[in-house]
Amino acid sequence: MADSNVAGRAAPIRPLYTRVLLKLGGEMFGGGQVGLDPDVVAQVARQIAEVVRSGAQVAVVIGGGNFFRGAQLQQRGMERTRSDYMGMLGTVMNSLALQDFLQKEGIDTRVQTAITMGQVAEPYIPLRAVRHLEKGRVVIFGAGMGLPYFSTDTTAAQRALEIGAEVVLMAKAVDGVFTDDPRTNPDAELITAISHREVIDRGLKVADATAFSLCMDNGMPILVFNLLTSGNIARAVAGEKIGTLVTT
């Protein structure tokens, strides 16, 4: 991961948000490969630990794209529901890995899954998740919604609403939402603030349609930012002006 110069921050961060839902793409956990990159997971865990120590409550949803992507497996002839369940299992592997590295950072962490896996995780119980957060624990939601055809973006939006998070922090491998694809258009400009409605009107991509509709209909802000810059999770929680903030 690229390191930013954060040595100049003299005081600990002061969180703007009390409770956040952090959405992490599974592809980043693999470092661009199939499987897990321990260095990436460790770096993410350090960033989350910094935020928790500042007093913020953090819940996490992780994708499983570094292991399986149901839609892609379907294109190769696999039955969609079965391939989606395989993807859900991938999210659990990522969740357990992040839990391990957070525990090594001294952060008490619970994994809750939408599919019962009693030996490795708690079942998803919203009130229990909130109680864990109030006690300063990180809660990682694994196995997506537990239903095929629903993405982990949708899971992030739904879980954020149900646990009373103030914002969905959508961590990406880019700096935010641009006017065009910056990989193909060097003149593409970063959009720092935009409304939910304008995102739709301009055809911009923030999250999948179901997830975005949930956030728009319920007034849930989304902050899209670059996870690959060290310290950005803390900056996002502190309300520093990074990435793209989508509000009603």
From Swiss-Prot:
GO CC field: cytoplasm
Binding site for UMP: G64, D84, M145, G146, L147, P148, Y149, F150, S151, T152
Pfam families: AA_kinase
Localization of this protein: Cytoplasm
Pathway assignment: Pyrimidine metabolism; CTP biosynthesis via de novo pathway; UDP from UMP (UMPK route): step 1/1
Catalysed conversion reaction: UMP + ATP = UDP + ADP
TM annotation in the entry: none
Modulation of this protein's activity: Inhibited by UTP.
SUPFAM superfamilies: Carbamate kinase-like
Enzyme Commission number, as recorded: 2.7.4.22
GO MF term list: ATP binding; UMP kinase activity
Residues spanning the signal sequence: none
Sorted UniProt keywords: ATP-binding, Cytoplasm, Kinase, Nucleotide-binding, Pyrimidine biosynthesis, Transferase
GO BP terms, alphabetized: 'de novo' CTP biosynthetic process; UDP biosynthetic process
Positions of ATP binding: K23, L24, G25, G26, G65, R69, F178, D181
Function, in words: Catalyzes the reversible phosphorylation of UMP to UDP.
Oligomer and partners: Homohexamer.
Family from the record: Belongs to the UMP kinase family.
Name of this chain's protein: Uridylate kinase
The species this protein was found in: Mycolicibacterium smegmatis (strain ATCC 700084 / mc(2)155) (Mycobacterium smegmatis)
Gene transcribed to yield this protein: pyrH
